[in-house]
Regions:
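Gram-positive cell-envelope targeting signals
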Residues: 1-37
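Beta-propeller-forming repeat regions
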Residues: 33-140, 145-295, 300-369
Length: 369
């Protein structure tokens, strides 16, 4: 994230770093890549960075292969450059998002593609970006400079909730432009606080966080942080491999969203296992049931959850969807179902009893009369 006068140096350095990230990503060493393929990757990295650094004016954006997201262009004041237009654009070839900043004469004074949304597929140029869901300009750190809150939409085949998910990010303004604190971006996305601008703001400004839902070791710790147990659905169950455990479904309210989790807690109050049935959904609308029964016929109790969730549609509308999760108890713990989901989708009027019987029938159980 370097100003215009250093751009040629930045382009060379960024190209090198991007290529290194591709060549030495965690998975890369698992595959044999021929020298010609390595050269192709290096050439692609350099070609992309050359196009990016060649954008000197707003008119160059489209000419060098970037499509401006017209409805997300905003004016703002940047201390280093004065009044500018923030122009987000999507690279046509690799679906990478770039933020260009231009002055009143249309000159590009700053640009960056160093965004969390461009790191969804580690070590690759091609990303999953589909567009921008929300942008907000706020002074988040109290230095009298406007920072940028950004939420993008990414899509891949194996995600739930319309096969799309959100990625949150924050760019803090400094004396030279903007910088990212990757630790904050990591927490925003790793702990599901990327659902809305208000959600991210609640974390960054108000100090609330969902992190404890994933790191707490006891039920008391969960409750101390505001986790609300669904007492009517909480009960003791004997799990063949884990012993007597309290099944604890519950919620945590942050901003305008309700986060849903299920825990298994032992007699000493320690969390033995946790489940995240929401997946990529944004909000729990209604919890319809939690059941502990042997579903796959191996003599061990499994866990089934049925709920109604909500998420934001492509046009900003709220979408409601019934969905279920089944976790099979095995020797090493619990494993989520992947087979039944290929054949059975719950309906708006589906019940927990119907779900359990359908799942048991799939595994060869005789229907109960």
């Amino acid at each position: 994230m370097i100003p215009l006068k250093y751009r040629s140096f930045y382009a060379r350095a960024a190209a090198g770093l991007l290529c290194l990230s591709v060549l030495f990503s965690p998975w890369y060493g698992r595959f044999t890549v021929h020298a010609a393929e390595e050269q192709d990757i290096l050439s692609a990295c350099h070609a992309y960075q050359k196009r990016l650094s060649s954008v000197k004016k707003e008119a160059d954006i489209a000419a060098y292969g970037f499509d401006i997201i017209e409805n997300q262009v905003f004016s703002m004041t940047v201390k280093a450059f004065g009044d500018v237009s923030m122009i987000p654009a999507m690279d046509r070839t690799y679906h990478r998002l770039v933020l260009f900043f231009t002055d009143e004469d249309g000159n590009t004074v700053y640009s960056t593609d160093q965004l969390e949304t461009n790191n969804q597929v580690r070590g690759e140029l091609r990303q999953l970006n589909q567009g921008i869901s929300a942008v907000s300009f706020q002074d988040l750190d109290g230095d009298d400079k406007m920072d940028i809150l950004l939420i993008t939409s990414c899509e891949k085949n194996d995600s739930a909730a319309g096969k799309a998910y959100k990625v949150g990010d924050v760019l803090f303004q400094n004396e030279h432009g903007f910088y990212r604190d990757w630790r904050l971006s990591d927490k925003i996305n790793r702990f599901g606080m990327n659902k809305s601008i208000r959600f991210i703001e609640s974390f960054l400004v108000d100090g609330y966080s969902t992190e404890f839902l994933y790191t707490a070791s006891t039920l008391d710790e969960l409750k101390e942080h505001g986790f609300a147990v669904a007492e009517e659905l909480s009960s003791w169950r004997t799990f063949e491999k884990l012993g007597s455990l309290l099944v604890v479904p519950g919620t945590y309210r942050m901003a305008e969203y309700t986060v849903f989790m299920v825990y298994l807690v032992n007699e000493q109050g320690y969390i033995v296992w946790s489940f995240q049935p929401m997946g990529d959904y944004e909000n729990l609308y209604t919890l319809k049931g939690v059941a502990c029964r042997d579903i796959d016929g191996d003599g061990m109790k499994d866990l089934a959850v049925l709920a109604r969730y909500s998420y934001e549609g492509k046009d900003g509308e709220m979408v409601l969807e019934n969905d279920y999760s089944i976790y099979y108890q095995k020797t090493g713990g619990f494993y989520p179902d992947t087979e039944l989901r290929k054949q059975y989708q719950s309906k708006d009027d589906s019940t927990m009893e119907e779900l359990v019987e359908t799942a048991r029938a799939y595994w060869g159980w005789r229907q109960e009369s």
